[in-house]
Regions:
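Active-site environment of divalent metal-dependent phosphoester hydrolases
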Residues: 11-16, 40-43, 64-70, 124-125, ...
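Acidic, His/Gly-rich catalytic cores of divalent-metal-dependent hydrolytic chemistry
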Residues: 168-241
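Anionic-ligand binding region
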Residues: 130-169, 173-175
């Protein structure tokens, strides 16, 4: 059986990333795919990117990565990430724009005879030229909604991120939200392992404990703009919309 590791939305959480990557290698994953969003929210985006490169992870473009490439360091409507925060993170990533610009929006793999698309989220038809390349995030996805959203996709399954919350939905295709590696309230770094041979594929979710206290300290020591707020909103979920 061959194996592919899939992670998503690391968002500068080096503490989570540095435990999940060696675990995926230990489990025999010959390829690891990150489905977008290295940048913003967490305190160590640059260090995360360097570690992803060390492990030869295939990085796909997320909306925050795209913001960095296009230097869109302003607060956006409906976003909880401030201009000050984005400016700080983008400054920490200085010199890496060209590498981030090389991230593809999606890749496909044939696993067990099935075509799988990996991406950050469902793309607009004109995603390469659109003002915003991804369709609006659906907070309450269903098979019917995803079937409509992904109707033009020629594939059997889609693995994606963006919402940070894992889900597994079977409609006309298989829809799998990988969930964020560590952008949640649990002190666990999470990932998916896809196993396949010539005729079949399946997948399992894995979780590895990581040092959440270390992350929390880096986000609240006063260095990261809005770090305490972002910790409460994106990780602890003690602040709601």
């Amino acid at each position: 059986m061959e194996k592919i590791g899939v992670i998503s939305d690391i968002h500068g959480n080096l503490d989570a990333l540095k435990v999940i990557l060696p675990k995926l290698v230990e489990l025999g994953c010959k390829e690891i795919i990150h489905t977008g969003d290295v940048a913003d929210i967490g305190p160590q985006a640059r260090e995360c990117f360097e570690l992803l490169k060390k492990y030869n992870v295939l990085c796909l473009t997320g909306n925050h990565d795209r913001d960095f490439v296009k230097n869109q360091n302003v607060h956006k409507p409906m976003s909880h990430v401030s201009q000050a925060h984005k400016q700080y993170v983008f400054s920490s990533l200085d010199g890496l724009q060209a590498e981030f610009a090389e991230f593809p929006y999606y890749v496909t793999r044939i696993c067990g005879g099935k075509k799988i698309v990996f991406e950050h989220y469902c793309r607009e038809t004109d995603y390469l030229t659109a003002k915003y390349p991804f369709k609006p995030l659906d907070p309450h996805p269903t098979a019917e909604k995803f079937d409509e959203m992904y109707a033009k996709y020629d594939c059997d399954a889609v693995f994606f991120g963006h919402k940070h919350e894992p889900c597994d939905i079977i409609g006309k295709k298989l829809y799998v939200d990988v969930g964020s590696v560590g952008c949640h309230e649990f002190p666990l770094a999470t990932a998916i392992v896809i196993q396949f041979d010539q005729t079949h594929f399946d997948y399992q979710r894995i979780a590895v404990p990581y040092d959440f206290d270390s992350l929390a300290h880096k986000m609240t020591d006063g260095t990261l703009p809005d770090g305490e707020y972002l910790l409460k909103f994106y990780f602890l979920h003690t602040i709601k919309d």
